Structure formats: C-alpha cells, structure tokens
Amino acid sequence: MHPIRHAKALVRERLTELVRSEVRAEMRATATLAAQVVEARQADASRLASTYDHTKNPNDEFYSGLADRLRRAGVDVQTRQVDVARFADWVEAHAGLGAYYGDSATRVEKLLEHYLAGESTHLTAGMTYIDVAAAGSHWVPCLRHAGLDALSLDLSYPQGVRGWRIGADAQKIPLPDGSVDAMSAQCAFEMFQGGADVGFISEAARLLRNGGGLAIVPLYVDDTYFIATSPYTVVDPDSFDEDATVVWRDDEYDAPFSRHYSPEALADRLGDTLALFSQVRVVHMTNLESVRERWPGSRLYAYFMLESRK
C-alpha cells in the first residue's frame, strides 16, 4: 500500500477506536445514571437526604443539642452570636457582592458566610488570603479592592498560579510553606470527596504562617454521619466514607457529594489532623433567628464554623 494511503488508514482506524471507546463510556455512564434515577425515585425515606439533613428545617434547640454532643466528643465548642447591626452595615457596604447572589433565599446566608469567615480570620489590608474552592465567587475581587493580596483557588481553573487565580487540588496548593496569612472555605468543604477533607486541613496547616487562621463555614454537623449524592451524577463509590450513610439528594440541587459529620465522626475523622494547629474550636452561632427576623424569608444554616489558628 502507498505510504500516504497506509497512514490515512491507520488514522481512520485509530479514530474509529477512539469514537467507539467514547461511545461505550457514554453508554455506560448513561445506563448508570438511568439506574440511579430509578433507584432514587423508588427509595424509601431511609435512603433520602431530606430524612437526615436538618439544614432544610433548622431548629435552634436541635443544633444546641449537637453542640453538647460535640463537647462530649472532646471538641472545644464556643458559642457566639452574630452582631446583627454590624452585619447589616457590612451587607450595605458590600452591596456589589450581594447583587451577585441576587434575590435567592440563600443570599443572606452566603453573605453571612463571607462575613463570619472574615471576622474569624481577622482579614485586613495587606494580608495574603486564599478563598478555597472559590469557583465563580466575587469575594476575592472585593477583598483585592480592599487592599488584600487575595487569591481564588479552584480545581476548575487552568492549572497553576495565574495572577490571583490558582488552579489546583486543595490538597496540593503550589505555594511555599508558611506563605499565607488566612484561608477560608465557604459552603465548599462538605463537597471534598474521599480523603480530601483531611488532606485539605493538613495542607492549610502547611501553608499558614504561625498565627494564621483557617475558617470553614458552614461546618455541616448533623445527627447522623451521612453523605448525600445526586442520582444525576456519577461518583466513584470509593470516595464515600466507609462508616457514613450514603443517601440520595431529593432537593433542587445536583451536587454530586455533600458530607455531613455527626459530632462523633467529626472528632474521630478530623481530630488528629487538626492537632497540627495550635488552636482549634467549633463555633456555634446561637442567634440565627435574629438574623432571620432582620431578613425575613432567608434560609440560614451557618450554625457551626470550624475556626483554627496555626
């Protein structure tokens, strides 16, 4: 065969193999999704996240009980209240950030998470700060405008450090030891699959300077240790914690993975790694009802925040 014809034949053969491989993979994924959707629709209450997820119907007394269980598990728990007047002033001063969240029921919750993280880590001009799993958040641009050397980190960004964006796994951040003053994760930590929750805390301890702070808000603590997954996504079964109950999401969100610790699981799973910090506490916010009264109709669930200092 002529060399050019032979080369063309090899290319066609290779392309055909690639297409067939992609089609087979897509068919397998589609079949898996279809089976999951059927299973989720037929599942009884014991297999549905709404049975276990108390953030959908918050109860202050319930979360106070969880705080007591955390203490019995050996966790340092500090009660704290949102200064509603001060937070209202902050919301007004960050109107642009509020506009990003629109008129959703979680708008005030999202703003509260940023506010609490900033208060916890004492963010001020000149500090180096990383917003972990930032995705499309406008928080870092706000902080940069205020004079901070603020950086956004997300796995979805192009890999490497590119200006103020870092594309990397939160367990392997390409920055030197002790180069960061503060870090926080807002409504993100619960989505860290497999051992990434433990791995991230270890990485934060490496990156933070002595005295630097880490805030994780909300810290999802619930009565039962469970992981919620969407039937509309395919998750590697090995990423589910062995001792957690795995349930189907039955809300409007399609997030593939959301981990809620029980008080005992939190202490057992994270305790050794958190020992890398000089100070660790879980902050229990006890007056979210007052925030709801100020902004009626808001869905609030930042009852707990993990606050650590290097």
Enumerate the predicted regions with their spans.
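Extended alpha-helical heptad-repeat/coiled-coil "stalk" and oligomerization rods
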Residues: 1-51
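A conserved beta-strand element that flanks and buttresses the S-adenosyl-L-methionine
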Residues: 184
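Short amphipathic alpha-helix with an adjacent loop that forms part of the alpha/beta core around
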Residues: 172-178
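A short glycine-rich, Lys/Arg-flanked "PGG" loop and its adjoining helix->strand segment in the class I
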Residues: 198-213
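Class I (Rossmann-like) S-adenosyl-L-methionine-dependent methyltransferase catalytic domain
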Residues: 7-10, 42-172, 215-310
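Short N-terminal helix/helix-N-cap motif within the alpha/beta-hydrolase-1
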Residues: 193-195
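Short catalytic micro-motifs in class I SAM-dependent methyltransferases
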Residues: 187-191
